[in-house]
């Protein structure tokens, strides 16, 4: 019964068409990361500058497209590299995310969490967003999330 009521897709994210935009209550994944460009004609050739920019790095693309797939109030839960939250070059994407969603939670996961199973030492975060298109003012945590601040160690 549920397969007739709920959409379940197991295909490349870039292949998901506009027909499913705004249909999901939840988008969850341990997303790929890196500076790999994605070709998604609707994003690469579209009028939205943030969407065009997102196609230049696969992790940013997943966040922007993931939000597009959600219904209003839907949740996005992604495990991602720390670069999404930390890198100054990702500030425009974080700003876009905070303009289109509420920051529900941002958790820094323990170092080496995936080293045994995935063979990677990359630091990871769990980011949970709730879609809210056209929201007004960002709260204090959302404002902090969009900023990159250098911290001296030692």
Regions found by a protein language model. Give the residues of each.
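Flexible, glycine-/basic-rich loop-and-beta segments that form/coincide
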Residues: 116-154
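Flexible loop residues that form catalytic
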Residues: 32, 36, 111, 132
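Conserved proline-anchored active-site loop of SAM-dependent methyltransferases
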Residues: 1, 7-44, 60-70, 75-84
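Conserved Class I SAM-dependent methyltransferase catalytic core
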Residues: 52-115, 122-129
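Short, structured coil segments at secondary-structure junctions
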Residues: 2-3, 99
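A solvent-exposed, charged loop/short amphipathic helix patch at secondary-structure junctions
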Residues: 42-52
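Switch/connector loops and helix/strand junctions flanking conserved nucleotide-binding motifs
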Residues: 34-38, 86-88, 115-118, 136-139
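A short acidic, often aromatic-flanked loop/helix-cap motif at beta-alpha or helix-coil junctions
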Residues: 13-16, 112-116
């Amino acid at each position: 019964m549920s397969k007739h009521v709920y959409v379940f897709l197991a295909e490349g994210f870039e292949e998901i068409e506009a027909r499913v935009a705004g249909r999901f209550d939840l988008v969850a994944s341990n997303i790929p990361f890196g500076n790999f460009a994605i070709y998604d004609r609707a994003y690469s050739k579209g009028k939205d500058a943030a969407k065009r920019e997102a196609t230049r790095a696969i992790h940013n693309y997943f966040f922007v497209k993931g939000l597009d797939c959600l219904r209003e109030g839907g949740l996005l839960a992604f495990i991602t590299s720390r670069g999404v939250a930390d890198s100054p070059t990702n500030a425009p994407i974080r700003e876009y995310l905070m303009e289109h969603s509420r920051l529900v939670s941002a958790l820094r996961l323990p170092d080496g969490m995936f080293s045994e199973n995935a063979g990677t030492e990359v630091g990871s975060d769990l980011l949970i967003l709730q879609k809210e298109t056209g929201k007004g003012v960002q709260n204090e945590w959302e404002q902090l999330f969009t900023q990159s601040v250098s911290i001296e160690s030692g």
